[in-house]
From Swiss-Prot:
Keywords: Carbohydrate metabolism, Metal-binding, NAD, Oxidoreductase, Xylose metabolism, Zinc. This is Probable D-xylulose reductase A. The keyword Ribosomal protein does not apply. The gene is xdhA. NAD(+) binds at G182, A183, G184, P185, V186, G187. Belongs to the zinc-containing alcohol dehydrogenase family. Coiled coil: none annotated. GO terms for molecular function: D-xylulose reductase activity; L-iditol 2-dehydrogenase (NAD+) activity; zinc ion binding.
Length: 358
């Protein structure tokens, strides 16, 4: 990890194996298509998936077999544009959507490109991520930031896009009650988006009191710390303490924890909607009887799709969602590994890594 930032062309933070990272100077990527742009990356957030690859070397079927650049929550400044680019120019500040679909398969043509089987997603093996000085994207996957959104905030458009997709999957409407399990970055942003969509009650659930305290200050109308009792008992408490009557309209799970899934199913009203946004173990026990007899709508949510990033930028630009308060630390590029260690230790909410300084 000794490569000099002063002489490097495209210094990159590379994962070689479990807890094995290095700074490597790589060639500046070429524009492969006339619609491509070269982005000078300015800020990158550390995501739980990045930490998981660093800790375990894999996520499910995605295994790091070759050295891979980490990072996918980024913002930057346009450094070069292809000959067919019309919507961006050198110097524009952008949020970067880090997955490129094939654009030809049925999900892509149906507007669900997040389900594309040929998706080239940053920092998902075998594709390199954005923790480098430069990164290439198609122009339509770069979203120009208005003047009132900073580049630091721009890096949070990625997790906000995830939250927007989850809340849209839930079809949250004004006046509804929404329970969000998991008060990490995505769960907190789900609370904020649900509030922007007009939800009347937004209840954040977590086992860590500091997270709940922040959630209450941030966007939740109330919070709930589960007791070490059955899911049915926790659901009963949730309903009574929050005057939910027969149950909540919407449950969003951003934790992936099996007890949260169980409690979420039991706390919903008949005909309610459940959206699974958090990933945990690949298989869990599931309260199928409650789901069936209450005729619940159950949906999964994966990354983000058509319109989600645009809406995310719009929510922040209009002041309806605040992402600035989630940024609890910014470190220099050469301290990237230490930042990963701190995130793994649960310090802060969202840590950003600053890009290479010219």
């Amino acid at each position: 990890m000794s490569t000099s930032t002063a002489t490097a062309q495209n210094l990159s933070f590379v994962l070689e194996g479990i807890h094995q990272v290095k700074f490597e100077d790589r060639p500046i990527p070429e524009l492969k298509d006339p619609h491509d742009v070269l982005v000078n990356v300015k800020f990158t957030g550390i995501c739980g998936s990045d930490v998981h690859y660093w800790e375990h070397g894999s996520i499910g079927q995605f295994v790091v077999k070759d050295p891979m650049v980490l990072g996918h929550e980024s913002s930057g400044v346009i450094s070069k544009v292809g000959s067919a680019v019309t919507g961006l120019k050198v110097g524009d500040r952008v949020a970067m959507e880090p997955g490129i679909p094939c654009r030809r398969c049925e999900p892509c043509k149906a507007g669900k490109y997040n389900l594309c089987e040929k998706m080239a997603f940053a920092a998902t093996p075998p594709y390199d991520g954005t923790l480098a000085k430069f990164y290439v994207l198609p122009e339509d996957f770069c979203y120009k930031l208005p003047d009132n959104i900073s580049l630091q905030e721009g890096a949070l458009m990625e997790p906000l896009g995830v939250a927007v997709h989850i809340v849209r999957q839930a079809s949250v409407t004004p006046g509804q009650s929404v329970i969000v399990f998991g008060a990490g970055p995505v769960g907190l942003l789900c609370c904020a988006v649900a509030k922007a969509f007009g939800a009347a009650k937004i209840i954040a659930v977590d086992i860590q009191k500091p997270r709940l305290d922040f959630a209450k200050r941030y966007a939740a109308t109330s919070t709930f710390e589960p007791a070490k009792v059955s899911a049915v008992d926790n659901a009963d408490r949730l309903r009574k303490e929050n005057n939910l009557g027969v149950g909540a309209d919407v449950v969003i799970d951003a934790s992936g924890a099996e007890p949260s899934v169980h409690t979420g199913i039991h706390v919903l009203r008949p005909g309610g909607t459940y959206v699974q946004g958090g990933m945990g173990r690949s298989e869990i026990m599931f309260p199928i009887m409650a789901a069936c007899t209450k005729e619940l709508t159950f949906k999964g949510s994966f990354r983000y799709g058509s319109g989600d990033y645009k809406l995310a930028v719009g929510l922040v630009a209009s002041g309806r969602v605040n992402v600035k308060d989630l940024i609890t630390g910014v470190v220099e590029f050469h301290d990237a590994e230490q930042a990963f260690k701190e995130v793994k230790a649960g310090k802060g909410i969202k840590t950003l890594i600053a890009g290479i300084q010219d």
